[in-house]
Amino acid sequence: MYIAEITERLLEVNRLLLKYIKDTELTFEENLVFSGFYHDYKDINSIINSAEKELNDSPAILMEQAKALSAAASDFLATYESHEDIFDSYNPQPVCDRHIKPLEKEYDSIAYAASQLWKRYSQMSVRMDYLNPEDDDYKAIEKESEEVKARYEAEKAKSDETYRFYTAEREKTAKLYFFEMIYLEMLVVRMKRIADSIIKDIEELKSEGKI
């Protein structure tokens, strides 16, 4: 089933290639389909290992899957080769910047607000150390400091949540930022060779009566 999964995702890559040719621009998430496919399947040995297991379990299914992968790879390569100039100029950096910069700015703003509240709370705590707990000033500051602390804790929780999201998006962006379409082309060439080799091997085994 691993090869079928690859084929399904390659078909989505092919669809987006055609869209890119037409529009010359894709969303951040659509661009991630390209880099995600490459990073998830660049270990080509995993395809070979999956094929070897499938050959023992169900060679007929493997043959069907290999043919589907070979066809999808052929479509990719035909599209790539006929529009190579467009794909050579592929540059995901602007869309990455448009995606990540606002998130970075949002996190910095929330983190700064939280730090200012903590600073204010710390200053009030220091001031309270020099006051008599029975004084009205102390009680007033104590009440205010509790309110400031509560606001800080809420802002800090918001800051932590924003940071987790920002970090996750930054990791996605890092994989895409310097991605080049040629990486995908080289990977698909290797995938097609493997798929065609699987087809040939199964046909030979059939002719020899071994399966």
Predicted regions and their residues:
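Leu/Val/Ala/Ile-rich N-terminal alpha-helices, chiefly Sec-type signal peptides and the beginnings
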Residues: 1-70
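Extended low-polarity, hydrophobic cluster-rich segments
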Residues: 6-14, 33, 44, 69-76, ...
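Long, compositionally biased alpha-helical segments
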Residues: 29, 75-78, 201
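Amphipathic alpha-helical coiled-coil segments
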Residues: 44-57, 76-79, 83, 106-114, ...
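Short, charge-rich amphipathic alpha-helices with coiled-coil/heptad character
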Residues: 51, 58, 69, 73-102
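Short, charge/polar-rich alpha-helical segments
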Residues: 89-122
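Short helix-loop boundary/capping segments
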Residues: 125, 129, 133-136
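Long amphipathic all-alpha helical oligomerization modules
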Residues: 137-211
